[in-house]
């Protein structure tokens, strides 16, 4: 049995897949993206988060059975609203065996995997066998830029994108728009060229920058010094995708 660590469980979410969903946020991520909007999901261990109102511990351990029981209790309302369960993070691939065990215990619920794609191929394939839809985050195509802004190269991510396409599990590409970093015309055009012919692609979802990230870092006692100007408006250049016939939406 593989126990997992969760930093949040959000009920009645509407942006993490079809219908009304429960989103499970797994703790721990191999990337260190500047401006991550869930910094409480970066560490694999529990952390204390402080605010003016309270101090609380973020990171709860669950067995697969415990989490499955909780999710199955919600199954009737999720199914009635054409929804299901979404596993997000952090990075679910870091806890792939735990996630797989939980999915195997669910009562025929629709499952979405939200991933950066940064993980072992065998772990990704194991989860692809169990999910109905994938939300795949794609930030930067240029390798050196990816290293600079996330702390890791993107070779594994781009490889797993091909693995995903070959699996024929339908997927959505999510692009977090960080001002001056991921929202440039060069980067968005490169993403469009990379994905335009991939089987299984449903559409691209552009996600404008979340300016609340800085407050979360401070509450966790973490430094937040972005090299970009977070006050700048993001460039939503949907035409980069339109020109290549790629369906695009903006969150």
Where are these predicted regions, by residue range?
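N-terminal [4Fe-4S]-dependent radical SAM core
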Residues: 1-63, 73-81
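Short glycine-enriched, charge-decorated loop/helix-capping segments at active-site entrances
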Residues: 53-57, 147-153, 220-227
